[in-house]
Amino acid sequence: MATIENFATVRYTSCGVTETKVSNLAEIGLESAVTLTKNTLGDTYGEDSVLTYIITVTNTSSSPISDITVSDDLGTFEFGTQELTPLTYTPPALLLIDGQDTSAQLTVDNSVAGSVTFSFPTLAAGATANIIYKATVNEFAPLEIGSSITNTATLESSSDCADGTASATVTVSEGANVSVFKQMSPNPVVCGDTVTYTIRIYNYGNVPAEDVELTDNFDPAPTNITVSRDGVLLVATDYTYENGTLSVPAAGSTESVTVPAATFTRDIATGVVTVTPGIVEYVITGTI
């Protein structure tokens, strides 16, 4: 809340002498003529997530306010001597006033790095405006467990009594993010030769992928197969291979395979976060 401070000065003459007296400092609180709130649809984010934000401006005064601007810092934070912005404004934006689409009145400016500014001309007494927009998580966003992004909206207008700030925080989602890559060699292969299948299981998430089970249906089915995991040859009891279908671990096995969580490294010079996935690699060989 802003404060209005004021004091009075009295000058007078007594017995031919001019004197001055200053009153005490009087203070009153100045409440804004608007309420400003900021919310998100969902409260978590991940790599490349698209977040939806809603900024709500309500004119609680008895007079209209004009020249309204709302600036969002897109979560900008300090990193060493740099300022990094983990969110990228993703157009378009919508403006709803008392539930009516008035987006034609909305001006959006994202030409200044680290912010986006929304402007509209007026808001009637008692009216409510909702600015709805999206932002995409970019390469500067922290992804480790416990990370968060807080972005703050700042409202200004032609009235000294119509301003304010509001923030919203999203936390990084926790979980594994698995992808699988497979390749075969040589190419081409001749009947009777040995073929090698390489399967890599990547985890781009911040939590390990546990109890991983691999199933592969080969057609045609190779014979005399060998199976290795991360360079270690597995014995026949470590997997099941029947009718061309490979299962690792073996059916009924108590063995648990885990793909480690990714590691996240922020470049000191650029601030960019690099994701290095956890990996488990299987190599299967057999005769075609």
State where each predicted segment sits.
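Exported/extracytosolic protein signature
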Residues: 1-288
